[in-house]
From Swiss-Prot:
Record keywords: Glycoprotein, Membrane, Transmembrane, Transmembrane helix
Protein name, entry field: Prominin-like protein
Residue ranges of the region described as Disordered: 918-1013
UniProt keyword Transmembrane, yes or no: yes
Phylogenetic classification of the source organism: Eukaryota, Metazoa, Ecdysozoa, Arthropoda, Hexapoda
Gene designation: promL
Transmembrane residue ranges: 32-52, 215-235, 489-509, 535-555, 852-872
Biased composition, class Gly residues, residue ranges: 950-963
Residues annotated as glycosylated: N99, N116, N576, N618, N803, N824, N949
Length: 1013
């Protein structure tokens, strides 16, 4: 059972393998069948495609667009060189010669930060979207700004209500203007200027010095602020005067520059629309006038009928070539004669040298010379063998036969027949060209009208802008008329008052800093007492002028704010400023412009703001006018100069003659040309002569060979080789003689023959062919040209005529495009216009309004600085008025701090001075030294001398309270009532017993020279 199962399993495996192989074969058959079907489908598709392509190919072959094999376009030679078929117009470029007037130097730039501050104040702090209330700025004659009636009436209620921050500021100033005079009255009536607490000057000396220093620094800072304010006031006041004075000059410059700008625009437009059109017209008229010649030449070039002209050139040059060939024949004979003589001569030299080497000189030197000199091949040069030269006589006979037969008349007759085709072309074009010329003349009139219209429009726009500029320079003239005369006087008074206060304060500060302290004993000039007096004077003067100065500053502040909102703010914020929108609405330029015939509708008004914006963008005047529908230069593209451009140019036929009967060469003429090509001249070409026409007649230079022979002769010994020596010497002479007599002649003959042959080739050859091929090629080309003219000449001429009309239309379109491009990019840039306009605006805003605002900044700055100056000056005045006595007693009059019995030491606050006499003036120091010599200044300090004796000796006698024996002597002021410039003496108390020991004296008070704090 197991064996049967083992046998069944292999059989099943074999059966499964056979089934798989059968399936693979079936799959392969299906793939082959599928590929066969696909291949058959591709073959059928290819056959069908071939049948479709064949007619298309035939049509392409018949397409007249390929006029000449291997050439593109119309088959002309100049087109293959990259040159246009009809050359374009070369326009001259406009060169401006404008010179604008020079603007005056700008105002000082040192005030720019002040002006920028006022701009920031008005633009950022006080900025409002709503315009200023009515009645403060009015528009006169729709173009000039002036102050309104509310300014004349000093009615500022609406303005202050509109700007609440301005209201607060004005209220503060008004309160100060009113209150300060009352404070001044109280200050003077209650004697505040004299109520300065003295205190204890010796006790508070150090603190007083510190207070003086701090107050002095504060006053110095305030004085610097005053200086800054007065400088601003003076400079801006001068700028206001200059701004009002430059009005007429600025108007004159603006008029001149506007005229210059207008002339430049007009000249540029005239150059584009008149001068450049005339250039284009002249160019097109020239092409139309010579169009028949151009078309005929292109027809000759494409049909290759120029071969007749080449044939005529070849045959007409035959007599000249004949003369040259006869010269070549004569030179050939001379060449053969002289060449044979030279050849025979060098052969004799070779024979004699070989004989001498073989028989007369068997030395190694002679054998070596024979080998190295190459003399064995001296006569083997091809240039000496003229057997290969052609027979020139046959060429001469062939030329004579051609000249005698007058073959040159054949191409001349063909050219005369071809000229009839040119006459037909000229006749046909005479019906087409005159209308084109009339259209060009009419186009010149059209562009002249457009140039005049454009000039009028531009002149109207510029005139209006210039008028607005001139009127804008008159803005706020009423400011000068109303305040101009008194304003300058008032401003000058204010500046002088501030300057007076400034000088007094500076002088007071200098006296207080460098003057002596007040002592109460006859103070000198320029001391601190003088400084206190000057400060008091400054305080009183400030009280007197503060209200006046602040009132003037307030007036300028209000005036500057109103004028700024009318002149500068509109230019600052043209989009958002409502006042400018209100003013801009009344400035319309359209009523100055000429009426537009092409646009009968009411165009949108051109605003000054739009003009300014265009100038900012550096646009041209044509861009600005196009954007506002005044004039669009792009409308020139609608102009149709040529009337035929309205039609289909493909249907235009400029030539309608039958050229099928044109014959260039008859059958007889062709036979004659064939006979001429097969004459004796048939094989002529200069290349037949060139292999034999060379100048290397010998392998070596004969002169060099003669020198070698001389050298060899000199090297041989005599008399052993005497005959060889003589032989070599003679051969050297012969070699030199042959070179001198034959080589130059032969060389000259060869060069002349080459030149003649080259000239003959140029005369009777075509494209470097020999004569027979030249005649054959030119004849065949003429025959093909004849067939081209007969079959395709008419279509070719019409194609060139259509190309001419298209080229003229393209030239006119290019001209119009050039005008539009130049007008939009180069004509009338707004930069000069902006320059002209902003010079007028500069007169108002930057030269009048800004200085007004700068003036109130300087004035109010000084006025506000007066307030802290009052306080600081009063404090400093009290410090300067303190009296510092020489001695301060201790006891009944007042005990010093700590209850010390010693007197007050004046040097406690003088750390920097240890020697009292250091600061004593020179006069007093000398007087003191003289008195010291007279008195015993250095007393005996020994114990034997009692203090009482010493003091008694110094003091002398005396009575009263000051006597030495007085009981109250200790509490009396020991200093003299009048200081005599001597150090004070110190005494023992009356009750003190005499002491034999040395005792240190108590501190003493010695004022010395007055300190300068």
């Amino acid at each position: 059972m197991g064996e049967v199962a083992a046998t069944v399993e292999p059989l099943a495996a074999v059966k499964s393998k056979s089934m798989r192989s059968r399936k693979r074969r079936q799959r392969r058959r299906r793939q082959i069948a599928y590929l066969a079907i696909c291949g058959l489908s591709v073959a059928i598709f290819g056959f069908a495609l071939a049948t479709l392509i064949r007619p298309t190919t035939a049509q392409a072959d018949a397409d007249p667009g390929s006029w000449r094999k291997g050439y593109v376009g119309h088959g002309t030679t100049h087109e293959q060189l990259g040159q246009p078929h009809w050359p374009p117009v070369q326009y001259t470029v406009y060169r401006p010669t404008t010179n604008y007037t020079k603007a005056p130097p700008p105002p000082t730039s040192a005030m720019n930060p002040i002006f920028n501050f006022t701009h920031f104040l008005y633009d950022k702090v006080l900025y409002r979207d709503e315009p200023i209330p009515e009645g403060y700025i009015v528009v006169k004659n729709s173009d000039t700004l002036s102050l309104g009636p509310k300014v004349e009436e000093n009615d500022w209620r609406d303005l202050l209500a509109h700007y609440w921050m301005v209201l607060i500021w004005v209220v503060i100033l008004v309160v100060l203007i009113i209150v300060i005079p009352f404070i001044a009255v109280c200050y003077c009536c209650f004697c505040c200027c004299r109520r300065c607490r003295q205190g204890c000057p010796p006790c508070t000396s150090k603190q007083d010095a510190q207070r003086r220093f701090c107050c002095g620094i504060c006053l110095l800072i305030l004085i610097i602020g005053l200086i800054f304010g007065i400088i601003i006031a003076f400079v801006t006041n001068k700028m206001i005067d200059s701004g009002f004075a430059e009005t007429s000059e600025t108007m004159k410059r603006g008029s001149e520059d506007t005229c210059t700008y207008l002339k430049d625009v007009a000249d540029h437009v005239h150059h584009l629309m008149m001068y450049n059109y005339e250039e284009m017209e002249t160019h097109v008229l020239d092409q139309l006038t010579h169009a028949h010649r151009h078309i005929f030449l292109d027809l000759s070039d494409t049909s290759e009928s120029n071969s007749l002209a080449e044939m005529e050139r070849v045959l007409e040059n035959m007599p000249e070539a004949l003369e040259l060939m006869r010269q070549v024949e004569k030179m050939e004979k001379d060449l053969r004669f002289y060449g044979s003589q030279l050849r025979d001569g060098v052969r004799g030299i070779k024979r004699d040298v070989n004989f001498a080497v073989a028989n007369l000189c068997q030395l190694q030197m002679c054998q070596k010379f024979l080998i190295s000199s190459n003399i064995e091949h001296i006569d083997s040069s091809q240039c000496l063998h003229f057997d290969n030269l052609p027979n020139t006589k046959e060429f001469v006979e062939g030329m004579e036969n051609i000249v005698a037969s007058e073959y040159y008349a054949i191409p001349q007759r063909g050219l005369s027949r071809l000229k009839k085709v040119s006459d037909k072309v000229k006749t046909q074009l005479s019906f087409v060209v005159p209308p084109m010329m009339r259209d060009l003349t009419k186009g010149r009139t059209i562009f002249r009208e457009h140039a005049t219209n454009v000039r009028n429009i531009v002149e109207g726009v510029l005139s209006d802008i210039h008028i607005k500029t001139l009127h804008s320079t008159k803005s706020f003239e009423d400011v000068y008329e109303r305040f101009g005369h008194d304003r300058n006087v008032v401003s000058l008074i204010v500046c002088l008052l501030i300057l007076l206060v400034l000088f007094i304060l500076i002088f007071a500060l200098l006296c207080g800093c460098f003057g002596r302290r007040r002592t109460g004993y006859g103070d000198e000039c320029c001391s601190k007492s003088t400084g206190a007096t000057c400060l008091l004077l400054a305080i009183l003067l400030i009280f007197c002028v503060f209200s006046f100065i602040a009132l003037v500053g307030l007036f300028y502040f209000m005036l500057g704010m109103v004028t700024y909102q009318g002149a500068c703010a509109p230019l600052r914020d043209q989009e958002n400023n409502t006042l400018f929108r209100q003013l801009d609405a009344s400035i319309d330029l359209n009523h100055y412009l000429p009426p537009s015939e092409s646009n009968k509708e009411v165009v949108q008004p051109l605003k000054m703001s739009s003009a300014i914006k265009a100038c900012h963008a550096n646009q041209t005047i044509f861009d600005m006018m196009r954007q506002h529908n005044i004039y669009d230069i792009n409308d020139l593209t609608r102009i149709k100069v040529m009337s035929h451009s309205q039609e289909n140019t493909d249907s235009i036929k400029v030539f309608d003659e039958d050229l099928s009967t044109v014959v260039l060469l008859t059958k007889e003429e062709r036979d004659e040309l064939k006979t001429a090509g097969e004459s004796k001249l048939a094989k002529y070409h200069s290349s037949l002569y060139m292999p034999s026409l060379c100048t290397q007649f010998t392998p070596m230079n004969l002169n060099a060979l003669s020198e070698q022979l001389y050298k060899l002769s000199n090297d041989l010994e005599y008399p052993a080789y005497g005959w060889a020596k003589v032989s070599f010497w003679n051969e050297g002479l012969n070699t030199k003689a042959f070179y001198r007599n034959f080589v130059p002649k032969l060389t000259s003959l060869v060069e002349k023959m080459k030149a003649n042959l080259k000239k003959i080739d140029e005369l009777i050859s075509y494209e470097n062919h020999d004569f027979t091929n030249t005649i054959k090629i030119l004849t065949a080309t003429a025959i093909n040209s004849e067939q081209f003219i007969q079959t395709r000449g008419k279509d070719y001429i019409n194609a060139l005529g259509g190309n001419l009309t298209n080229s003229i239309d393209q030239m006119i379109d290019d001209y119009i495009d050039m005008i539009i491009k130049e007008a939009n990019e180069s004509v009338g840039h707004c930069a000069p216009l902006s320059y002209i306009y902003y010079r007028g605006v500069d007169l108002i805003c930057h030269r009048i309004v800004d200085p007004i605002n700068g003036f109130w900044v300087g004035i109010l700055l000084c006025a506000l600085l007066f307030l802290p100056i009052l306080f600081v000056a009063h404090r400093l005045m009290c410090l300067y008025k303190k009296i510092y006595p020489y001695l301060a007693t201790v006891g009944a009059a007042g005990v010093v701090e700590g209850g010390s019995d010693y007197l007050y030491d004046a040097y406690s606050e003088r750390d920097r001075e240890h020697v009292p006499l250091a600061n004593v003036p020179k006069k007093r120091r000398k007087a003191y030294e003289r008195r010291r010599e007279q008195q015993d200044y250095f007393e005996d300090a020994s114990p034997s001398v009692s203090r009482g004796n010493r003091s008694g000796g110094d003091r002398g006698g005396g009575g009263g309270d000051g006597a030495p024996g007085s009981s109250s002597m200790r509490y009396n002021d020991m200093a003299p009532t009048h200081w005599d410039h001597e150090p004070p003496r110190y005494h023992n108390p009356p009750a003190a017993p005499p002491s034999s020991e040395y005792e240190r004296p108590p501190p003493y008070y010695y004022p010395g020279a007055s300190e300068q704090d």
